[in-house]
Regions:
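Hydrophobic positions in alpha-helices of CheY-like receiver
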Residues: 9, 41, 94-98
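Charged helix-capping and loop-helix junction motifs
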Residues: 3-7, 35-36, 85-92
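EAL-family c-di-GMP phosphodiesterase catalytic domain
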Residues: 18-31, 46-167
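Extended low-complexity acidic/polar segments
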Residues: 36, 41-46
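Bacterial c-di-GMP phosphodiesterase EAL domain
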Residues: 1-13, 26, 40, 55, ...
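Generic alpha-helical secondary structure signal
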Residues: 1, 9, 35, 135-136, ...
Length: 167
């Protein structure tokens, strides 16, 4: 598996460090096999991440042992922040726990300046969501890369919190 990935990358002259291999939380059913595969991928230079953490069948009791670089919190965490202060408290505690375990934390589903501010004050490393850019086709993304003065996103120009995609 890892060797096969490396053969393909070598054929096309792609550095494994340029790619991120994502593990979905629901994939953890085969945890032991995945743990070995992720370790092998990391040793080969791949960046590894857990996507949509907290969405599926949680494996919070195993996360400290999984060889990952990043954990991506699913959009449900942001939706809870909009409901009440308990959602914000839960999000902050989750981010703190993941950071204490040595992970970079990315929050998905960010859709407002308020959410960006909450994440900035919570220690979140990276954010993504419709607040920064709606999903783009490859052609639209390519056009955006060459816009002068732009930072790879269509930020809301008239808003105070139009950062470039990171908290």
């Amino acid at each position: 598996t890892t060797r096969r990935y490396l053969e393909i990358l070598e054929k096309y002259k792609v550095d494994p460090g340029m790619l991120e291999m994502e593990l979905k939380e629901t994939d953890t059913i085969r945890y032991e096999n995945i743990k070995d595969l992720l370790r092998s991928l990391q040793e080969a230079g791949f960046h590894t991440a857990l996507d949509n953490f907290g969405v599926g069948s949680s494996f919070i009791n195993l996360i400290a042992d999984v060889p990952l670089n990043d954990v991506k919190l699913g959009r449900g965490f942001m939706e809870k922040c909009e409901k009440d202060y308990r959602g914000i408290g839960f999000l902050r505690q989750m981010i703190e726990m993941l950071k204490n375990l040595g992970f970079q934390v990315l929050c998905e589903g960010v859709e407002s300046a308020r959410q960006v501010e909450i994440l900035k004050t919570s220690g979140c490393d990276h954010v993504q969501g419709n607040w920064f850019s709606m999903p783009l086709s490859a052609k639209e993304f390519e056009k955006m890369l060459f816009l002068p003065g732009e930072i790879f996103c269509r930020c809301r120009k008239n808003e105070e919190h139009s950062t470039g995609g990171e908290a």
